Each structure stands twice: as structure tokens, then as C-alpha cells.
Amino acid sequence: MAQVSMKQLLEAGVHFGHQTKRWNPKMKPYIFGARNGIYIIDLQKTVRYFKSAYQFIRETVQNGDKVLFVGTKKQAQEAIREETARADQFYIDNRWLGGMLTNFATIKKSIERLKKIEVMAQDGTYELLTKKEALNLEREREKLEKTLGGIKGMNKLPGAIFVIDPKKETIAVKEARKLGIPVVAVVDTNCDPDDIDYIIPGNDDAIRAIRLFAAKMADACIDGAQAREAAIRAESDKAETDKVEVEGKGEAPAAEAAEVVESADKA
């Protein structure tokens, strides 16, 4: 299992929370103290809770599900896109549309529309349209790509969502909870941890902190995918071995029967 060290957390500024006047009292158990009017997050607890979150994400992917990364704040967008591409997962980095999960059937129609326009752009259909029609289609494609590009391949609901700043992504968290989809989130000192299934106490504003956690959760996805592939290969190898053994057992009685027939003929 990939670990996160205290050194990595300190270098990324994960321990810096919000100003003491901007906090959620429910985060008190995860706060070490305050310095110059800024809450300091207890990194020992960050390490402990990170391990649980990592293991859960790994198991989710190992079981065949995908993880939806959600980070629409500017500091999170690039890291979310890059890490989900590396781990072959899904993401929302621009704006969370209401019903993205709870009304997924409608969202899927928009995704299909996006895919259809992309095909039209590639197969020469644009060239058969007027300049205005082609321009309108391209604008529609760009708009859909901006909002839904990160979930184009998502044919079913995710097995979990990983959120940067659940206070900002309130709607996403509420939809996931309504559907029973587990929520993993980086939770800063101004957030409500009660709505999160697997919290990771930490700075959700610093780019380095966000990138660290996005990369680690992507690693968890990759670990889970590799474990799943290994299990499938092992099962396939076992099935092949069992097949060979069964065929071998079938050949032995046939050979014995042939010997009996041959002996009878000689007699």
C-alpha cells in the first residue's frame, strides 16, 4: 500500500487550516492547535485517516467500480484532470450540474449527444452543413465537453466519489449520500465532516496539498486495478489447469478400455 509521510504532508502545507474565525467546531478533533490566527491540522490523524481512505478507494476499484474525482475550484482542476487520466478514472473539474448523479439517466443523454457531435466533426458531416450550423454545433460540443468531458466514458454510477473541498461541492456530496455512494474527501477546518464517509483532514486550498492527495488517490485506483487484473489472471490460469486435469483423467480410462479390447481380440 502506498503511504503518505509526515515530510510529504509538511512540504505540501497540508497542516495549514483556515483562520480561527472561519472554522467548523465539528473539526475540533482533527486540529492540533492554532498559530498566528490559523488553525494547524493534526497530521498524525491525517496519516491515519488517509490510510483508511486509500484502502477503501483501492478496494472499490479492485471490485470493478470506478471512482469519480470532483474538484471544481481553480486550484484543483489541473491536478484532477491529470491524475484521473493517469488512473483511468472519471472527473468533474468545471461545474457540478444538479442531478449529475441523482438524474444520471438525463445526464447520459447529454453525454450521448456530445459523442454524436464528436463523430459528426470527424466523419465529414460538418462539411455538409452551412457555416452557421457547423459553428453552432461546435459551440454546443465545446459547452458539453467543458461540463461532461470528464465523464464521457461513465456508463453507470461510480462506486465512490473523491472530493476536494466538500464545502464547495455540497451538491455533489448530497447527491452521493442520497444514492448511498460513499464519499471520500479532503476536509479542511471550515468543513462539516459528518457528511463524509472517509475523511482526510487537510488543507484543501493549497495547490501542492491538492495535487498530493489527488495523486495518492489515483495511486490507490491504480493499485486496485492491478490487483483486479492479477485476480482475473489467477482465476483464468486455475480454470485452464483444471481443464487440463479433467481432460487428462478422461484420456486414462479410454486408454485402459483400448487395452482390454486389444486383449480380448488376441484371446
From Swiss-Prot:
GO BP terms, alphabetized: translation
Domain of life (superkingdom): Bacteria
TM spans (from-to): none
GO molecular function: structural constituent of ribosome
Provenance organism: Syntrophotalea carbinolica (strain DSM 2380 / NBRC 103641 / GraBd1) (Pelobacter carbinolicus)
Alphabetized InterPro entries for the sequence: Ribosomal_uS2, Ribosomal_uS2_bac/mit/plastid, Ribosomal_uS2_CS, Ribosomal_uS2_flav_dom_sf
HAMAP family: Ribosomal_uS2_B (MF_00291_B)
GO cellular component: cytosolic small ribosomal subunit
Signal sequence segment: none
Keywords annotated in UniProt: Ribonucleoprotein, Ribosomal protein
Region listing for Disordered, in residue ranges: 233-267
Basic and acidic residues bias spans: 233-250
Compositionally biased residues, Low complexity: 251-261
Family under the similarity heading: Belongs to the universal ribosomal protein uS2 family.
Pfam families listed in its UniProt record: Ribosomal_S2
Protein name: Small ribosomal subunit protein uS2
